Amino acid sequence: MTTTRHRLLATASRFVTTLESLDVDAMLAVRSPTCLHHMCLPSFRNYSITNDQTREAFPQWKATITKYQFGILDDSQTLVDEQARKVMIRAKTAAETTVGDYNNEYVFILRMTEDCDTVDEIWEFYDSLRLRDLHHRLEGGHVPIGVDAPAPFTTTGSNSLDRSK
């Protein structure tokens, strides 16, 4: 018999695997149709995006990446709250982009659906200095970013989507 904890961890593992795959269909398949992805970085910009917005932004993001690795930084720091259906993971990325290397660390909090099979909400926290450096290099390389660019390349403005529970 599979426990709630095992189902939550299996879904979190699929989330990580799909991020590394750079396959937008696989990335969205592990999410519920109403999943919101919150970028939580007060010193840079907070915003939330839907699955449709993720799909729209993905080609631009993927076009800047030539090699990509994403994974759990430390399994011992993974936390599971079975009652809230949440998993917190600490992750890292190492990428080669069209404007040089990009490395970052992340904390993801994933809230799963009631059956624990898909991710219903994502809170993503990351090192803003490293992201800002990448944005400056992209701007220098004339990659369109800013208010009119699709997320995750938007740098100003706000999004009022809120699914606080």
Curated annotation (Swiss-Prot):
Q: Give the pathway listed in the UniProt entry for this protein.
A: Secondary metabolite biosynthesis; terpenoid biosynthesis
Q: What InterPro entries does its record include?
A: Fungal_Meroterpenoid_Isomerase
Q: Name one GO biological process term.
A: terpenoid biosynthetic process
Q: How does it assemble?
A: Homodimer.
Q: What else is known?
A: In A.calidoustus, the austinoid gene cluster lies on a contiguous DNA region, while clusters from E.nidulans and P.brasilianum are split in their respective genomes. Genetic rearrangements provoked variability among the clusters and E.nidulans produces the least number of austionoid derivatives with the end products austinol and dehydroaustinol, while P.brasilianum can produce until acetoxydehydroaustin, and A.calidoustus produces the highest number of identified derivatives.
Family label: Belongs to the trt14 isomerase family.
Task of the protein: Part of the gene cluster that mediates the biosynthesis of calidodehydroaustin, a fungal meroterpenoid. The first step of the pathway is the synthesis of 3,5-dimethylorsellinic acid by the polyketide synthase ausA. 3,5-dimethylorsellinic acid is then prenylated by the polyprenyl transferase ausN. Further epoxidation by the FAD-dependent monooxygenase ausM and cyclization by the probable terpene cyclase ausL lead to the formation of protoaustinoid A.
Q: What is this protein called?
A: Austinoid biosynthesis cluster protein J
- Give the gene name: ausJ
